[in-house]
Amino acid sequence: MLLAWVQAFLVSNMLLAEAYGSGGCFWDNGHLYREDQTSPAPGLRCLNWLDAQSGLASAPVSGAGNHSYCRNPDEDPRGPWCYVSGEAGVPEKRPCENLSCPETTSQALPASTTEIEEASEGPGADEVQVFAPANALPARSEAAAVQPVIGISQRVRMNSKEKKDLGTLGYVLGITMMVIIVAIGAGIILGYSYKRGKDLKEQHDQKVCEREMQRITLPLSAFTNPTCEIVDEKTVVVHTSQTPVDPQEGSTPLMGQAGTPGA
């Protein structure tokens, strides 16, 4: 019983962890930032990058993916930012606040200068254009030449797996799975309780039946005892009639029947 509840609890925790994702950090211009921040400031919420960029002609071509977290696709010196809904409903760029991530010994460092030089020489012109922003300003033309290399270092993540927003359907499925697991656990408890009660009732009825049979069969056992068997008595009748015997010599009585001697 306890094992069933432990399994249900572990599965629920895994579903919640999959729905909300685990937090991580990413590098940007030599700093670590939290990877799962969805609010640039208190009271504001980031819009989905694909939805916001679809309505803007000046949005960065590279983008940041299908999510609503703070990123820096155009290498803004102020750090990561995101789109928020403006007064007229038009997406507006807003820098993210309180986004710093504490460094740990297990975090990877940015690419070295040697790797940057090799990366700048390796890819061709077509590959460089994939990382270069389309709306780079003329004043930043010199910095735009190294932006493709910075874009490569920016993709160094603490988590190799990019988090995805499951959306409302994912949350609904997670809650449904939790409800099903709880229902299964409750069903197991009820089934066990019912079966246990039924077994106890059958044992009680069997004991009552055995006591009743003992009470009924006890008087009959007395008659099966050999010492208590009843024997039929036989009446013996003795008759007093005598068989006539012939008289012999010497056997004549000295006195007759009439009582006269010598008769």
Swiss-Prot record:
Record-annotated membrane-spanning stretches: 169-189
A single GO cellular-component term on record: plasma membrane
Protein name (Swiss-Prot/TrEMBL): Phosphoinositide-3-kinase-interacting protein 1
Region named Disordered: 242-263
Keywords of this entry: Cell membrane, Disulfide bond, Glycoprotein, Kringle, Membrane, Signal, Transmembrane, Transmembrane helix
Extracellular face residues: 22-168
Signal peptide: 1-21
Organism: Pongo abelii (Sumatran orangutan)
